[in-house]
C-alpha cells in the first residue's frame, strides 16, 4: 500500500508542471498591444518570450519584440513608454529609477548566463593585460562588472573595445580582432561547436551570478493595465512550464530565431539553460538577482546612493498570475 501511494505521488509531481502549463487563462479586457524590449538581438534566453508572443498573437493579442543595440536604450525606451515591458539585466533599470523613472521588477527570466572566453594562449585573467577585450556596452551590467573585476581583482588594464551583440564578439574573436570577451552561454556553446579546442572559458568565480535577466514594466502602463500585465505574465509562466515539462517544444523556436546555432547543439543548449543557468523559473523565481546585483555594485562603489530593492519590485502582478495558474510544487 505504501509503495502504491508513493507511486501515485510520483506520478502527481511529474504531471504537475504539464497540467499547470495547460491551465486556460481568460483573455483580459483592455488594450492587448504589448511591445517587449530586448537589450540585443534575440538570444536563447529570449526564446520562451518569443514562443509566448507567437501563441498570444494567434489568440488576438498584438505582442511585438523590439531589439535594441544597447542595454541602456532598451531601458530608456521602457522609461519613456515607447515599450511597455523589457527583458533586462539589473543595472540599467536601477540607474533609470535613480534618475526618476517609474519602472518595476516583475519576475525573473534567468540566472547568471555569461562566461568570459579567450584564445587558448591566454591562460587566466592576468594574461589579458594590454590585450583587446570586447564588451557589449559601457552601461551593460555584465560589461561594467567585468571591467571592475579585471581592474580590482586581476589588477590589469586591458584594451577595452565595445562590440554590441554576442554573435558579433564571437566573429571578432574568430577573426583575431580581439583576444578575449564575455558572451552568453548559448554563444559559447555555439562557438565551441564550430571551433572545438581553439578557445576556452576563463574562470571568474561567482562574478557572473549577477548577470541574470528579469522582466521590468513601465509603471504608468502597469497602473492602467494591471490585468493585461497579470495575464501576460501568467502566459509567460505557462511557456516556462511547457519548456520544463518537455524541452523539445522550444527547439523549433530556437532553430527559427537563432539560425546560426548548429542544429545538433540546440537540445544540449536548452538543457544547459534549464540546469546550469536555472532559466525560466516555473513560479517566477525570486528577487535574489536584483538584491545581489545592487549589493555588488554598492560594495564596489559604482552605486553612490543607497538602493532599497524592495521599492523596485511590484509583487502583485506575479502573485496574481500564480493565483490564476497555481504553483508548481518544489519549483522556483
Residues covered by each model-derived region:
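Short, low-complexity disordered leader/linker segments with a strong preference
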Residues: 1-33, 326-332
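Short, glycine-/small- and polar/acidic-enriched structural segments
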Residues: 21-165, 172, 179-185, 201-209
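Conserved C-terminal helix/tail region of periplasmic/extracytoplasmic solute-binding proteins
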Residues: 295-332
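Short low-complexity, flexible loop/linker segments enriched in glycine and/or proline
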Residues: 101-103, 196-199, 320-322
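Proline/Glycine/Serine-rich low-complexity intrinsically disordered segments
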Residues: 121-123, 223, 282
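Pocket-lining segment of extracytoplasmic ligand-binding domains
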Residues: 91, 167-260
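Secondary-structure end/capping motifs
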Residues: 225-304
Amino acid at each position: 500500500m505504501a509503495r502504491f501511494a508513493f507511486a501515485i505521488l510520483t506520478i502527481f509531481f511529474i504531471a504537475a508542471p504539464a497540467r499547470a502549463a495547460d491551465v486556460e487563462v481568460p483573455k483580459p479586457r483592455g488594450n492587448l498591444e504589448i511591445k517587449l524590449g530586448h537589450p540585443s538581438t534575440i538570444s536563447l534566453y529570449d526564446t520562451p518570450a518569443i514562443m509566448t508572443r507567437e501563441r498570444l498573437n494567434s489568440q488576438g493579442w498584438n505582442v511585438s519584440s523590439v531589439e535594441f543595440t544597447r542595454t541602456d536604450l532598451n531601458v530608456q525606451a521602457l522609461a519613456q513608454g515607447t515599450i511597455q515591458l523589457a527583458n533586462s539585466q539589473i543595472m540599467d533599470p536601477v540607474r533609470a529609477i535613480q534618475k526618476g523613472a517609474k519602472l518595476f521588477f516583475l519576475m525573473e527570466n534567468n540566472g547568471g548566463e555569461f562566461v568570459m572566453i579567450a584564445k587558448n594562449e591566454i591562460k587566466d585573467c592576468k594574461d589579458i593585460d594590454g590585450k583587446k577585450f570586447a564588451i557589449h556596452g559601457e552601461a551593460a551590467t555584465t560589461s561594467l562588472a567585468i571591467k571592475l573585476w579585471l581592474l580590482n581583482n586581476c589588477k590589469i588594464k586591458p584594451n577595452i573595445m565595445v562590440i554590441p551583440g554576442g554573435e558579433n564578439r564571437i566573429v571578432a574573436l574568430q577573426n583575431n580582432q580581439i583576444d578575449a570577451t564575455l558572451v552568453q552561454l548559448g554563444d559559447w556553446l555555439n562557438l565551441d561547436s564550430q571551433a572545438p579546442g581553439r578557445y576556452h572559458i576563463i574562470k571568474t568565480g561567482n562574478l557572473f551570478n549577477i548577470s541574470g535577466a528579469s522582466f521590468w514594466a513601465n509603471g504608468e502602463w502597469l497602473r492602467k493595465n494591471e490585468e493585461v500585465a497579470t495575464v501576460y505574465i501568467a502566459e509567460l509562466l505557462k511557456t516556462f512550464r511547457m519548456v520544463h515539462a518537455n524541452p523539445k517544444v522550444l527547439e523549433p523556436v530556437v532553430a527559427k530565431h537563432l539560425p546560426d546555432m548548429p542544429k545538433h547543439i540546440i537540445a544540449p543548449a536548452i538543457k544547459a539553460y534549464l540546469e546550469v543557468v536555472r532559466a525560466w523559473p516555473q513560479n517566477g523565481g525570486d528577487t535574489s538577482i536584483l538584491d545581489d546585483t545592487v549589493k555588488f555594485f554598492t560594495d564596489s562603489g559604482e552605486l553612490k546612493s543607497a538602493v532599497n530593492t524592495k521599492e523596485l519590485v511590484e509583487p502583485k502582478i506575479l502573485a496574481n498570475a500564480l493565483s490564476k495558474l497555481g504553483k508548481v510544487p518544489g519549483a522556483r
